[in-house]
Amino acid sequence: MAAAAQNDGGSLSVHEVLCRWAPAYLAQFGAAMPSRQREVLQAILTCRTPARGGALHYCPNCDHRQFSYHSCNDRHCPQCGGQEAQQWLDENAPLLLPVNYFLVTFTVPEGLRRWIRSHPRLGYDLLLAASSQALQDLAQNPKRLGATLGLLGVLHTWTRTLEYHPHVHYLVPGGGLSRDQRQWIASRPRFLLPVKALSDRCRTLFHEALQKQMPAALADLPPKVWQQRWVVHSAATGSGQNALRYLSRYVFKTATGNRQLQLLPDGRLRWPFRHSGTGTWQHIDLQPFEFLRRFLQHVLPSGFHRVRRFGWLHPGGRAKFKRVRALLKIPPLLSAAEQAAWQPPGQSPGTSPAPTPQPNALPAVALRCPHCGHTLVLVSQWRPGQNWRALMPDPALGVLRTTGPP
């Protein structure tokens, strides 16, 4: 690694890198790869291509036609998920409470990482269960906080250089609900729970759960693993807004967005990253296959939920969350139906209130012809495997000028 420097080589996005080298990578390693990794690469390779289906728009002014193709919407695809992440942030920001927040991170010790990478579904489940329970056990201790926490946990598996480094971030309100649910018990402003005690408790819970669910695994792990302390970091994060924004970036993505890499003259790829300690930009140079290997380490099991809520933030704990808001004197949250039926004071029943402007809503913008600027008309849509020409309402449109291959 070295400090980032200028280079005259070409620039490629992460998606372009994957599409350029994935076919050769699959040809060489595909037979030995987990089927889930092959599935993800195939989705990325076909993202926004005719294989995904698409739509045809037509310009009635200059007879131009324009194809657009559907996204794969795979959460590992670097060019998908941007709008969903913003929507998730918009939906979760109103749930933040007017209290101090903490970002608590549990990191798996090195001795366990190889086993978890080989058993990702069970390993990640145990990690989330053990770390969340460790937080609750200590918080509920009357000598600590004496309260039940509300936790928002997000699993990450990568470092800034895409190495395998499984860890869980928890966004935690600084306080909790008393056992009798009659009191909000606030934590100290800059301190939530002791990290050494959290580390020991998480390790114990993980070991006990693994022994119960997969006892044979204990024989494959060196005993010294259970003497290693799990790294736990806890930091006050103010209102929680910035931490929530950070977590939102990777709720619908894995490891990286669609950033740019430099293609060096010797064929290596230059990956830029910001050093976590100094904050300075640095880089690491990787062979294309090594970049793909690192990227694929972070493919999640099919259907796995990397975002989970615990305590009174769990979907089944809505009554307790309402109680928390009442104790903090916060107006109750309204459902979509309640918001639609709500009438401002003094307004006659049955009249429709003026629509509330949505600051993050995007206006509906009509597609414009790139040649003449006229509004494009939707002619046809087709699904994967369908022949777009067979769905054309006017066969004459099949010979018009196009912006790209159908």
What residue ranges belong to the model's regions?
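Beta->alpha loop/short-helix hinge microenvironment recognizer with preference
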Residues: 1-406
